[in-house]
Swiss-Prot record:
Organism per entry: Cyriopagopus schmidti
Disulfide bonds: C51-C63, C56-C68, C62-C75
Keyword annotations from UniProtKB, A to Z: Cleavage on pair of basic residues, Disulfide bond, Knottin, Lectin, Secreted, Signal, Toxin
Protein's recorded name: U5-theraphotoxin-Hs1a 6
Domain of life: Eukaryota
The keyword Signal is annotated on this UniProt entry: yes
Propeptide segment residues: 22-49
CC per GO annotation: extracellular region
C-alpha cells in the first residue's frame, strides 16, 4: 500500500514537472497567436466591414449588403430577420 501511494505521488510530481517545463517553453505562443488573430481581424475590418456601424439616414444609404437601422440610425447587416 505504501509503495503504490509513493509511486502514484512520484508519477504526479513528474507529470507536474513535465507540464511546467513545456508551459514555460511555450510562454510566448499564446501572445503570438493572439497578436496574429487581432492583426488578421483588423485587416478584415478595413476591407469587409467598412460600413458596419456608420451613421446613416434614409437619404444617405449604406454600402452593399447593409441596411440603415430604423431604431439606431446606423448601418447594420441585411438579413432575413430584418424587416
Amino acid at each position: 500500500m505504501k509503495t503504490s501511494m509513493f509511486l502514484t505521488l512520484t508519477g504526479l510530481v513528474l507529470l507536474f514537472v513535465v507540464c511546467y517545463a513545456s508551459e514555460s517553453e511555450e510562454k510566448e505562443f499564446p501572445k503570438e497567436l493572439l497578436s496574429s488573430i487581432f492583426a488578421a481581424d483588423s485587416d478584415f475590418k478595413v476591407e469587409e466591414r467598412g460600413c458596419l456601424g456608420d451613421k446613416c439616414d434614409y437619404n444617405n444609404g449604406c454600402c452593399s449588403g447593409y441596411v440603415c437601422s430604423r431604431t439606431w440610425k446606423w448601418c447594420v447587416l441585411a438579413g432575413p430577420w430584418r424587416r
